[in-house]
Amino acid sequence: MNEAAKTLDGWYVLHDFRKIDWNSWKTVSASEREQMLNEFEALVSKWEGTEKAGKGSHALYSIVGQKADIMIMLLRPTMEELNEIENAFNKSGLAAYMIPTYSYVSVVELSNYLAGDSDEDPYENPYVRSRLYPELPRWKHVCFYPMDKRREGNDNWYMLPMEERKNLMRSHGMIGRGYAGVVKQIISGSVGFDDWEWGVTLFSDDVLQFKKLVYEMRFDEVSARYGEFGSFYVGNILEKERIPAYFHI
């Protein structure tokens, strides 16, 4: 049997996509809308407190296109906490005017493909910890997509020897490093959690960089031979102070 890559696992992640039922929302009185938005902002304030305590992170995004209107991205130490937050939101007044369109459950992951030899506990390394337990950047734009490694005929990633996979991932990673400071990415593993094997979340202040990065990686062997991709979602950061304006009728 081939050697499996070892992973370091951090916070659990929920990407929650919703459409807004604008027609129904328009029928609600201004005072009721205000009450529901106040309730939602109170939930977001609670999430902010968790983030300040270093026990999780979150961000809201306005999604472009018809796949969804809103994406809520949540990171927490346990799957139970994600479930509690999801249930609390579903019981809120605002959620009654939202239609779930997609969700993705995963855990922030670092693999040993690019790791060097060291006897230290990686969970005590500040750099590693910052990647496993990240505070989501408040950059202008987000791009999310799920992906698999292909398992077909001669293009079976899981049948390649470990050293070959390491070399391929090293080359693949060099492309990403070329976008350091321009694009931040969070890779989250979802084998056994969701329908794809990984979720990729990209952040940037220049939305065009998503296209440039993904296109350049298409020519790398890891993507060209072994990558399979799901739907792409792109959107813009929705800060708490902009929530009332976003839902204003």
Swiss-Prot record:
Domain of life where this protein originates: Bacteria
Protein keywords: Heme, Heme biosynthesis, Iron, Metal-binding, Oxidoreductase
Cofactor note: Fe-coproporphyrin III acts both as a substrate and a redox cofactor.
Sections of the chain in a coiled coil: none
Active site: Y145
Database matches in NCBIfam families: PRK12276.1
Family the UniProt entry places it in: Belongs to the ChdC family. Type 1 subfamily.
Name under which the protein is recorded: Coproheme decarboxylase
Gene transcribed to yield this protein: chdC
